[in-house]
């Protein structure tokens, strides 16, 4: 029963949080590169 609800939870996490983390790490890397 709970397995049917897993995709509705994993898809937003992969589609929203993962790109958000990628952009955050890219932003931090660029900011550190500019400071140095």
From Swiss-Prot:
Membrane topology: Single-pass membrane protein
GO biological process: photosynthesis
Record's GO cellular component terms: chloroplast thylakoid membrane; photosystem I
Primary site of residence: plastid
InterPro entries xref list: PSI_PsaI, PSI_PsaI_sf
Alphabetic keyword roster: Chloroplast, Membrane, Photosynthesis, Photosystem I, Plastid, Thylakoid, Transmembrane, Transmembrane helix
Subcellular location: Plastid, Chloroplast thylakoid membrane
Record family assignment: Belongs to the PsaI family.
NCBIfam families: PS_I_psaI
Biological function: May help in the organization of the PsaL subunit.
Protein name as annotated: Photosystem I reaction center subunit VIII
The encoding gene: psaI
